[in-house]
């Protein structure tokens, strides 16, 4: 019938990943947060990467087809981080991590910025030295532990934010030191930017026209 022909004329949308990893997600910063409880780091504008001990995946659960050398020697320990190409280079990180046939030239510009160990049962205060030791033991320049610091008050936090943004960074992340790794959004992880945007989930990539196609 005509209805069936009409449906068949359009390709099916790609299925959403059914095995999205259970990740810790960030809430938006609000004034009055007890800053003495938090570690602060740069918010890297890249693609969320989750190493489950065998496979590198995105936040949505899609497999990242990195070159074999990129993950060679990685531990069976899960690592949570950001696949990052540098400040102001989100488009390169995004296009590279989507490649079905990974290219060495593009991937040589990607770093895995590790900010947590989801499988560790300790608090973030306890996970942090374990994370730093693990990354150091790998000895791979493209795998780096995200530097963490403390700030004394809101004025110091805002000053750090503006220095980071002026240098080309996206913003800051605040991680509660006493928190366990729990999936979902909570005040355990906070994001702070000079402006906040609304998150949207991509369900399909369709061909288009124009300079952004």
Predicted segment positions?
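Short secondary-structure transition/capping segments
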Residues: 1, 18, 127-130, 187-196
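Hydrophobic alpha-helical segments with strong N-terminal bias
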Residues: 1-2, 30, 100, 159
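Bacterial N-terminal signal peptides
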Residues: 2-12
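Sec/Tat signal peptide C-region and signal peptidase I cleavage site
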Residues: 13-17
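Covalent nucleotidyltransferase
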Residues: 18, 30-141
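Nucleic-acid 5′ end/cap handling module spanning
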Residues: 26-59, 143-213
